[in-house]
């Protein structure tokens, strides 16, 4: 949650924030503050992995004076990274913050909590998204420690180009689901 505290301090109040599906973005919903509506765009209950980046591009086109920040995990951004070419070609200057934990975080947390840490298909290998962004002609920033996020966000917004901030997140820091939140889905077998 330290990441979101830092973002609260550095994001301009006119920011529009787009969220993806997944546990890191669920945390962001509660941890960030939103001003100047419409300022929060999320697929919350629909599980649209990869939604945030494309949504951010659309919000920026509709509201060009707003600072637009898209928050996503590495899995979701990996699905939609090719849209960077659209952002660069048309000058759609958003900032995408990729919380890179080298896993499908929601699935991994679910497997940890409900399947005794028996992980299947939860870990992924993601590229250095900051470097990939630069290959597309966007700006790329790497954040290895939370203390570096403010400077990276300021530089990304100031760059006036599509920007990607690749943030290293501890893959063991999983956001657990409440065990009772799925109780209604249990089937009783006799």
What are the functions of these language-model segments?
Residues 62-152:
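Conserved thiamine diphosphate
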């Amino acid at each position: 949650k330290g990441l979101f505290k830092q973002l609260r301090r550095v994001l301009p109040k006119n920011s529009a924030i787009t969220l993806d599906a997944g546990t890191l973005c669920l945390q962001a919903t509660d941890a960030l503050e939103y001003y100047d509506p419409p300022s929060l765009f999320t697929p919350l209950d629909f599980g649209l992995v990869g939604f945030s980046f494309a949504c951010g591009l659309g919000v920026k086109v509709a509201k060009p004076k707003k600072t637009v920040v898209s928050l996503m995990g590495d899995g979701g951004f990996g699905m939609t990274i090719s849209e960077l070419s659209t952002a660069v070609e048309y000058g759609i200057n958003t900032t995408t913050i990729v919380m890179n934990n080298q896993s499908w975080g929601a699935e991994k947390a679910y497997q940890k909590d409900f399947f005794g840490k028996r992980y299947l298909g939860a870990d992924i290998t993601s590229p250095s998204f900051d470097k990939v962004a630069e290959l597309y002609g966007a700006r790329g920033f790497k954040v290895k420690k939370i203390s570096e996020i403010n400077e990276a966000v300021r530089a990304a917004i100031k760059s006036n180009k599509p920007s990607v901030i690749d943030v290293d997140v501890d893959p063991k820091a999983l956001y657990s689901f409440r065990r009772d939140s799925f109780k209604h889905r249990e089937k009783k077998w006799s």
